[in-house]
Amino acid sequence: YHACAFNCLYCQNYHFKKHTFSTKKITAKNLAGAVDKKTNCICYFGGDPTPQILHAIKTSKIAIKDADGRILRICWETNGAMQEPFLTMMADLSLKSGGCIKFDLKAWDPGIHHALCGVTNTKTIENFQTLAGWTKKRPQPPLLIASTLLVPGYVDEPEVSEIAGFISSLHPEIPYSLLAFYPQFYLNDLPTTSRSHALRCRDAAEKAGLRNVHIGNVHLLAEGY
């Protein structure tokens, strides 16, 4: 999906915004019709799927009905800032289909989050906490996953430690991915995440109590700072 409720300075899909007001449309029925017998997962991302969440919900319901009992997992990658009724709809679809919801927890400090994303992280934190309560309904495969982009100079060990401590207080088994940063959009003058930065953040997350921490985008890690 093209739109997003955030305006991140490092957005890797910033060019998607140009298509938000495109005259080219696709109905939920037609989008669901793209699912074939080889498809076992629909993952919505963007941008962010939540500005068009009703379209995504309708598409998912049609696709699941057409699958007629065949495995079709519904997954989401989101900033987590949706209203709670929509979160419930998303979670219900993922729970029943065997899918997951990945929250991008961009920063813990409100000032850093606002500087990087242009908005508060209050709703994201509230929704993550709410969804963590669903995890006991289906421990495996995990319903809730978290990730954080390691932006040099902004998102470092103290930030990761706070985020990880929050996640751990809800459930220490929630998977957490630390993603290497690549310069994009307005932050194209920053370096890629260094290997030492990523390793220090992984240690901080594990010390905060998380048991399932992963470093992603390893190929981007540099040997700098």
Question: Which positions does each model-derived feature cover?
Answer:
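Conserved AdoMet/S-adenosylmethionine-binding subsite of the radical SAM
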Residues: 26-190
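Iron-sulfur (Fe-S) cluster-binding segments and ferredoxin-like electron-carrier domains
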Residues: 11-23
